[in-house]
A protein has these predicted regions:
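Cys-dependent protein tyrosine phosphatase-like superfamily
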Residues: 17-117, 131-187
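Bacterial N-terminal signal peptides
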Residues: 8-18
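Substrate/cofactor-recognition hotspot
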Residues: 124
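Ser/Thr-glycine-rich phosphate-binding loops at phosphate-binding pockets of nucleotides
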Residues: 128
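Short cysteine clusters
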Residues: 121
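Bacterial N-terminal signal peptides that target proteins for export
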Residues: 1-9
Length: 187
């Protein structure tokens, strides 16, 4: 009996460490109608996805999403969101040249949201991945390594050509980013 208890405790500890070692993992969300293939929940009220279609905007609104942050440089969500009450935000980014100011603006929008929000770019992988990695680090105190691992290996379709995003995370002074995000003035 005692051996069984000790074995159970040992296995429980090992399992806990293995889960902890896996780091962070976003929760896959499937909307009715399957409108989005790359939709994940990263925190309470914070989601990430690829570019939503008009039908996806309606499905997101029905799901309870009230705000959308578009990271695309040359595409607004005006047409896709037409006929919904979803509040649109936009921080124009190019995946090959994301800068700290853009990241801070995006993080402030997420911080100041009034309803659940979806963050997206075209595929929901690179620009969205960088913003979500910074979100994890700044707001959830996730390590840079775990945030990078989730961005690159989390099943979101990260494109290795954008290794600059990994460098951006590794080289970021997170305390300075955090201070700027929490400040009221523009970066």
């Amino acid at each position: 009996m005692r051996k069984q208890i000790l074995l159970s405790l040992f296995l429980g500890i090992i399992f806990s460490f293995s889960v902890f070692a896996q780091g962070v993992k976003a929760e896959k969300i499937i909307l009715p109608g399957g409108e989005l293939n790359n939709l994940y929940k990263i925190d309470s009220g914070v989601y990430r996805s690829e570019q939503p279609s008009h039908a996806a905007f309606k499905a997101l609104e029905e799901y309870g999403i009230g705000e959308v942050l578009n990271l695309r440089n040359r595409h607004s969500d005006d047409d896709e969101a037409a006929g919904t009450n979803v509040k649109l935000h936009r921080v124009k980014m190019k995946a090959h040249s994301v800068n700290e100011e853009q990241l801070i603006r995006a993080l402030r929008i997420i911080k100041n949201r009034k309803t659940p929000i979806v963050i997206h770019c075209h595929h929901g992988s690179d620009r969205t991945g960088a913003v979500c990695a910074f979100y994890r680090i700044v707001y959830q105190n996730v390590s840079k390594e775990d945030a990078i691992r989730e961005m690159t290996e989390g099943g979101f379709g990260f494109h290795r050509i954008y290794r600059n995003l990994i460098r951006k995370i590794k080289e970021a002074d997170i305390e300075q980013v955090r201070k700027k995000v929490m400040a009221d003035e523009e970066p």
